[in-house]
Amino acid sequence: MKFGVLGDAKIAREKLLPAIRAAGHEVTHVGRRDPSGGVDPVWGDVRVSTYEEMLADPGIDAVYNPLPNHLHVPMSIAALEAGKPVICEKPVALSVEELDRLAAVAARAEKMEQMAIAA
């Protein structure tokens, strides 16, 4: 499975990336608000682009969203509407209304929205 990651967050580099690799999957794309800054070398050979370009990439099977909390719902909705299942850091939403909106989009898209919880 090929993952796209929204942003170059520390939790993504330290927790998600090793877990994805250990499971035999790969991160192929990192989306950034400003892709010109590049990403941490730990990602290896990944494509770096804007969030929108990353979400439009048909080669990505799923998206991980470790962005700041206020961006969890809007960016997860954008990923779902792009046809990608989403793993989102907690909290998935900042209100019940946001969560209801996200759940409705996930149901319409027939894609999974999953919250990441570290063990």
Residue ranges and their predicted role:
Residues 1-43:
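N-terminal Rossmann-like dinucleotide-binding module
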Residues 101-119:
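Rossmann-fold dehydrogenase core element
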Residues 29, 61-62, 112:
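Short, Asp-centered acidic motifs that coordinate Mg2+ and/or phosphate
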Residues 8-12, 68-70, 93, 119:
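Short beta->alpha connector loops
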Residues 46-105:
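Beta-loop-alpha module in the N-terminal Rossmann-like domain of NAD(P)-dependent dehydrogenases
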